[in-house]
Every structure is written in C-alpha cells, then in structure tokens.
Amino acid sequence: MKYISTRNKDKVVSSSEAIIQGLAADGGLYTPQSLDQKVDLSSALKMNYLELAQCILSLFLSDFSHEQIQQCVQNAYQNSFENNEVAPLCKYHDGWLMELWHGPTSAFKDVALTLLPHLLTAAYQNQNENDLISILTATSGDTGKAAINGFADVKNTAITVLYPEIGVSDIQKRQMRTSLGNNVEVIAVKGNFDDCQQIVKEAMKNPVVLNACKHMKLSSANSINIGRLLPQIVYYFDSYTKLVKSGDIQLGDAVNFVVPSGNFGNILAGYLAKKLGLPVKKLVCASNSNNVLTEFIRTGSYNANRAFIPTISPSMDILVSSNLERLLFLLSDHNDVLINQYMTSLKEDGHYTISDELRHALQESFTAYDCSEEECKKVIYDTFHNEHILIDPHTAVAVHACHAYKQESNDTTPCIVLSTASAYKFAKDVYAALTGKSCDDEFETMYALHDYTSVAIPKNLACLKDMPIRFTKVIEKEDALATIAKRLEDLQHDHN
C-alpha cells in the first residue's frame, strides 16, 4: 500500500514515510492510493480485538513486518483499557452505544493514540532514522491528553500540544496541565481550535520553524496524520462482529453508524471500513450548533464564514474540518486539481461548493443532523433517567442525530452510536443537565455527579485533583510560530 497527497497524487510515499511526515509538504493529507482489498468478515468473526487490529493494519502498512505490527498492537492495547476491552457495546433503546472511552484518558482518541507512538517508532526503524521526532498537536480537548499519554518519555520523541485557552472543559484542561513526561510541553492559545489547528499546519511548512528543526523530524499526532486514522477503522469492524456473534444481526446485514463529528476523522474511518467491505448503509454525521458539516452534507456547500459558537460539546466546536479533504479526494477519484481548487477557495474566501455529481456520491454514504444546546441537555437527561445510562455531551449529540435520522428516514437498519468520552470529562455540564444545579469546582461536581448517578469515576480522572499543575503558558496566536520555533531550538540543543 502506497500513500498519495490529496493535493498532488503524483507524490507517492510508503506508509512509514506518511506516518513520519504527518502532513505532505504541499499541505495535502496522505491518503491510501487504493482501497481494493477487502476484510474477510467470516475470518474477522474468529478474531479478538488485537487480532482484528493486526489484520486490518496489515492491509495498510505494507512496509511493516508482521512482527512489527503485532508488537505495536500488543504494546498499545494489552492492559491499557478497562477489562481489556477496547470498545464494549451497550444496548439502549435506539440501538447500541460503542463505548470508546475506557482507555487511559477516558476518550476515544486513546484507541489511536496509544498505538501511534509505536507505529511512529517502527516507521523510524524502517526508514533507518535516528533523529529526534518532534510532534506538534492541536487539540480541542481530548487529543492533547491522549497524545501526551502516548508519547510521554518515548525515546527520541518530544511532543508539544496547543489548546484553546477558552473552550475546553475544566477537566480536559487539568488533564493536560498536570501531564507527566520530560519530553512534554503544553501551551494555551488565545483563540479557538481552528486557530490551533491552522498553527500546526502552518508550522509544518514555515521556513523559520523548519530551520529550527534542521536535524529533527517534524510530525503531528492530529488526524491529519494517517497513522492516527487507520487504528480507528478497527472498532467499526469489531462492533459489527460483536453483533453478529450475539445474534442481533446476521453476517452480511447492513448497519448504520452515528458519529459525533468535528474534524471528520472518526467518521472517515467508518467510510474506510465500508470501502474494506463492512456492510454499512449510512454514516450519520452528528454536529452541534457549529453545523457547518450538516449544511455541507445536505447541500454540497461548505461555508466557514460564520460565528464560532462555544458549546458544551467543545471537541466538535470546529469550523474548518480537515479530514473532509481526504473524503472529497476519494470520492472524486483522486482529482487533486479539484481538491486544490476547493482548499484554495476555503483558505481565501472561507467557502466552496462541490459539483452535483460529487454531492450525490457524498450522500450515498453520508447523511447529517445537528443538535442545539437544549436538545443536547435533554438527551443527557432522558438517557440517564429513562435508561440509567450516563453519556457525555458529544455522545448526546450523536444520540439525538440517531433519533432524528430514524424519524426522518423510517430506516429500521440497526444503528451503532459512537460514544466518544466519559461523562466525567464534562462533569459540570452533565450534572447541570441532569439536575439543573451548577457547581463551580470541577472536582466537587465530579463527586456530586457520582453521588447522583452511582456511576464509577474513571481512575485517571479521580486522581487529577492531587496532581501538581506543570504547564501554565498562555500565548497570543500571532506569537505561536515563534514560540514553536524556540521550543524546537531548545529541543535540538538538548538532544545534541
């Protein structure tokens, strides 16, 4: 399997090169050159999660040995998740919740980011590299801590995380600011997630930044890195095989997946699963009040020229959705000229409109719904009080979308909703939605939520209160590139 840039399909690299580089030099995203291979579902039924991960990753990592992939998967997933189950399913009235938050930082990003450091290290071995790898990562809350957890004190790596000063939950902020690891830096930016993400993209090709890291590699742990995306394909297959084995569906039956979406990486992994032969009828894109994706999927027009709305589901507070570029590249049969036109229009004018042909291709696999703040809170309330299932605001947005889709389409196909974070990461908003009460202290709220629901607090969150805060730096977004360059210079000096 080779990888090509969405902005120059003649730029062909190996999987190791794609993972190390993160972003192509032309600003494009590395995408599989072909998706002709299929996963044998009958064989998949006989596999546990680790075996399934090895099977699927082997299709994409052709320059990795079988032993390398096996070792990466075992190092990532053995003993890292509660009860050694990466993605358990929970039945609820409209279908199933795929609980992706039982990892070390209580968010779905753990599934990919426990594995990415091992993939990156193996890729380095394959390329006979021994320079320092500096990881730049923008986060809307969950990616940051999951990436830090994965890369902390990993040999020959350093990680720098940028997060918006306002817009992440108190618990998410505390998770990042108390992080351990001698190779870690965490910086708050006076801006939103789109600003942070743009800074990372600009840094990857900025001459001053690149000059500061002449003797190291610059990469990213965001979903712009294909190594972040590939591990997420696995849990789509895993959930399907679980339903077949439980007798809830027959092998070959179609299912729908409902995915809370911001940067579009998680739902794109579902589309890649479909291309590999998973019987997916619809991928339902769930958005909050920042409904640029809903509008795009329904109309074919992408318009980022709108007010940025901070919500109680901050990981979806995004106006520029990076992985959409990969999807359009795939749907347009690798039309890099078209992708360049769209991305230039987005950068210069803040909007673009795809052709009717491309919109029809998009709507064959995708549909979309958005959710207001009040609707989100009501779903949190109803899901707990009617079914005693505690969900976070992002999952609530997806549960709302699942119900709306069923109501509008009358589709009886089984639905699997991706539950992406522990409710305790957003304790203040969840507690307020359930009780109508507010509490200023995040830990008091966490304990109050536990007292109210009797749902266990994840250990990694319960211990946060006693951990010292290490990182307090806050910068203007205009100073970000200079700050990154200085960080890289210091890393280079220390490494030498």
Model-derived features: where do they sit?
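PLP-dependent amino-acid enzyme catalytic core
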Residues: 1-496
